[in-house]
């Protein structure tokens, strides 16, 4: 009998969202969004679920619903930096698997969370694991808001980009720049899913790594790890994840799903 990989789930929750202020505390069926996310992480089998925030109101909401919470600095440039502070404070062993569950994804699949944690444990040469799924729509390939990842033969990340990678020259070139006329990609193209599992060792070193030029150009923080020689294992899944909550329209859509009459 195999046992699930032990892991810790940390949910970074920043209150000062530009597009949707107070997002972690938005009501979803009588509970704050961040609590709904924590429930998903607990359902995934995390041995500990921690909500990390710079806002006391978020910590109070977490504790009111039975979740551990930790106060972090307000000046973190990314969720990974916030996780790094938590990892340093908690003193986890180097190989502890820590999953960063985004605080604005109340519909995240618990199975995917668990599988990404297990994927990291199965790849001891990698510091990070994440996930991706195949893209079949050319419009998504050319959408800069859809982050793509190119993989090697072992499904380890070669590069992440907002650009179409790999570029299917023979399929795309005759139609460029008419994106609407583009056929489906000739080679597999994968959409990155923003779910990460880290080794605690890497999290503790992350703040000391200089920002990478490619990270700044693409505005993708995972490129910092690649730039500094770390390996990222990518779990390929056929199931596209549920959309997160970034805008008021997203919030209204998700709130409708949590209404009692939506069952």
Swiss-Prot record:
It is found in: Cytoplasm. Its main location: cytoplasm. Pathway: Nucleotide-sugar biosynthesis; CMP-3-deoxy-D-manno-octulosonate biosynthesis; CMP-3-deoxy-D-manno-octulosonate from 3-deoxy-D-manno-octulosonate and CTP: step 1/1; Bacterial outer membrane biogenesis; lipopolysaccharide biosynthesis. It comes from the Bacteria. Belongs to the KdsB family. PANTHER family: 3-DEOXY-MANNO-OCTULOSONATE CYTIDYLYLTRANSFERASE, 3-DEOXY-MANNO-OCTULOSONATE CYTIDYLYLTRANSFERASE, MITOCHONDRIAL. This is 3-deoxy-manno-octulosonate cytidylyltransferase.
């Amino acid at each position: 009998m195999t046992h699930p990989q032990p892991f810790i789930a940390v949910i970074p929750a920043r209150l000062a969202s530009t597009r949707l202020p107070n997002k972690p505390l938005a009501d979803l069926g009588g509970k704050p969004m961040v609590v709904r996310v924590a429930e998903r992480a607990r359902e995934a089998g995390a041995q500990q679920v921690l909500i990390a925030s710079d806002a006391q109101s978020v910590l109070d909401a977490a504790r009111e619903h039975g979740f551990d919470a930790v106060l972090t600095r307000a000046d973190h440039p990314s969720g990974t930096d916030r996780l790094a502070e938590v990892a340093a404070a908690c003193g986890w062993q180097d190989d502890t698997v820590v999953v960063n569950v985004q605080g604005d994804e109340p519909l995240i699949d618990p199975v995917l969370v668990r599988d990404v944690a297990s994927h990291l444990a199965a790849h001891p040469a990698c510091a990070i694991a994440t996930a991706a799924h195949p893209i079949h729509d050319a419009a998504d390939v050319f959408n800069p808001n859809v982050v793509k990842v190119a993989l090697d033969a072992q499904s380890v990340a070669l590069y992440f980009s907002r650009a179409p990678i790999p570029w299917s020259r023979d399929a795309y070139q005759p139609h460029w720049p008419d994106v609407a006329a583009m056929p489906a990609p000739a080679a597999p193209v994968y959409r990155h899913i923003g779910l990460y599992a880290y080794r605690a060792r890497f999290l503790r070193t992350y703040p000391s790594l200089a920002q990478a030029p490619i990270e700044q150009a693409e505005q993708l923080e995972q490129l910092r790890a690649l730039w500094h020689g770390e390996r990222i294992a990518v779990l390929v899944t056929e199931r596209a994840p549920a959309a997160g909550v970034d805008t008021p329209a997203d919030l209204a859509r998700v709130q409708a799903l949590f209404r009692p009459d939506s069952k």
